[in-house]
C-alpha cells in the first residue's frame, strides 16, 4: 500500500505474513499477531517484505469515505515503491525499497 493518510484514525492487525510499516518517520517490521495504531493525518505505508501473502484487518474511526478505498476497488491503487506517483507533501521516502 503506497504512502497515504486520511482524517480517520486506524488500526492495522496483522493476521499472517511479515510487513514493513512506515509511520511518519518511524519504520518497523510487523508480523502475525501484531497491531499498529495510526493517528489521524499521519502518512503511512505498509509493504509485504515476506515470501508469503501479508493478510491483515484494519479499521477506521470515525466512519467516512477514504480515497484509497476507491482506488483499491477499481484496481488503480499503485503498488508501494513501484509505479508510485510522487510522494505527497509530508511523506518520507524511507520505505520505497525493501530492506536488505
How would you describe each model-predicted region?
Residues 5-21, 59-61:
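Short, conserved beta-strand element in jelly-roll/cupin
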Residues 11, 18-20, 27, 43, ...:
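Structural motif
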Residues 25-40:
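Short acidic-glycine-tyrosine-enriched beta hairpin
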Residues 47-100:
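Double-stranded beta-helix
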Residues 41-42, 61:
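Short, surface-exposed secondary-structure boundary micro-motifs
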Residues 17, 33, 56:
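Short hydrophobic/aromatic patches on the structural cores and recognition surfaces of FHA
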Residues 1-2, 21-22, 38, 44-50:
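Short beta-strand His + acidic residue motifs that chelate non-heme Fe in jelly-roll/DSBH
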Amino acid at each position: 500500500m503506497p504512502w497515504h493518510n486520511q482524517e480517520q484514525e486506524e488500526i492495522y492487525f496483522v493476521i499472517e505474513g511479515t510487513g514493513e510499516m512506515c509511520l511518519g518517520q518511524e519504520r518497523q517490521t510487523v508480523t502475525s499477531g501484531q497491531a499498529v495504531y495510526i493517528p489521524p493525518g499521519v502518512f503511512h505505508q505498509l509493504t509485504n517484505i515476506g515470501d508469503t501473502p501479508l493478510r491483515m484487518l484494519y479499521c477506521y474511526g470515525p466512519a467516512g469515505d477514504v480515497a484509497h478505498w476507491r482506488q483499491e476497488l477499481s484496481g488503480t491503487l499503485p503498488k508501494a515503491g513501484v509505479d508510485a506517483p510522487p510522494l505527497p507533501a509530508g511523506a518520507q521516502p524511507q520505505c520505497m525499497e525493501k530492506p536488505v
